[in-house]
């Protein structure tokens, strides 16, 4: 499964990278046919976040490593190295830039952006 990784490099700059998560075929719930499943991530909770249309924030760092799974709307994220990504429904991002210069975010257009946040250990 492909996802985007946002991390801090050794100089504290936030950077994007393409990443992949292996999915192994297992008999998850017999007698249903086998499915493809990733390894388990430890998480204490799941949150949903709605960012209003036009919402903008200056450089921030996430409070902890977390997956953002975009459900609706579009968020433009700018890493501190200047690279921009437009993220929308179905996109998955592992936010790991918890230290350093952080990243900027902006909801594109008037439509709200809805995402699920899953903090991971």
Model-derived features: where do they sit?
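Short acidic-glycine-tyrosine-enriched beta hairpin
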Residues: 21, 80-97
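Short, Lys/Arg- and Gly-enriched loop/turn segments at beta-strand edges
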Residues: 25-27, 101-107
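A short glycine-rich, His/Asp/Glu-containing loop-to-beta-strand
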Residues: 10-59, 113-121
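Histidine-centered metal-chelating micro-motifs
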Residues: 55-57, 76, 92-93, 99-104
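A short hydrophobic beta-strand segment most commonly corresponding to one strand
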Residues: 92-98, 108-121
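Short acidic, Pro/Gly- and aromatic-enriched capping/linker segments at domain boundaries
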Residues: 1-8
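Exposed beta-sheet edge/beta-hairpin loop segments within beta-rich domains
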Residues: 59-61, 107-108
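A short beta-strand-loop-beta hairpin characteristic of the jelly-roll/cupin
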Residues: 60-61, 67-88
